[in-house]
Amino acid sequence: MLKFNIFRIPVTVHPMFWVFMFLFVAIFAGENATALGITLKVLAFFLSILIHELGHALVARRYGAPVRIDLHGIGGQASYLLPNSTKKKTIIITAAGPLLQLGVAFIALFILAPLAQGTLAAGFIAPFVWISILLAVFNLLPVYPMDGGQILYEALPYNKKKIAFIVGVIVSALGIFVGLIYGQIFLAIFAGLGAWGNYQRLKQG
């Protein structure tokens, strides 16, 4: 288990994170993939997800919350207990993850990538950019508990919270359809889990 601090925030990377990341990348890498290429993509996923959770954690700490980051499975989580929580604070903290992820991706794309052309670093920067953009945009979809779904949930009036789960079911259903049409089984399965989770929350009221 890897443990370290970044900006005085404790980070724990669980062993299964690496297992799932290597399996995920290897499955979609293609027959011409090399061990080095797969490793660079796994490290790109690691840095991108860490930056995402760091966005949440830094803003939460700015509001006075003790924070920590855990990377596990195929994702991560910034844990915090926010004192004097408000809708505005929660929305800002939630949005900070994908926004920081996008910001760093565009810096890498327009500043670092041109400098790294023809070097080994280019094999890391290129996947880091598209991974970060895809993950950030994906996380902003209005499907609870992803960031977009959480933002929608917090933005709605108390008596309209169910709308967030209805939207989540609809968007997830579209994801299932797109996944099946284009043969993206992983997308269809993930969207199916999202649809089921939001349906269960809708039933619970």
Language model feature labels by segment:
Residues M1-G205:
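Hydrophobic transmembrane alpha-helices and their immediate loop junctions
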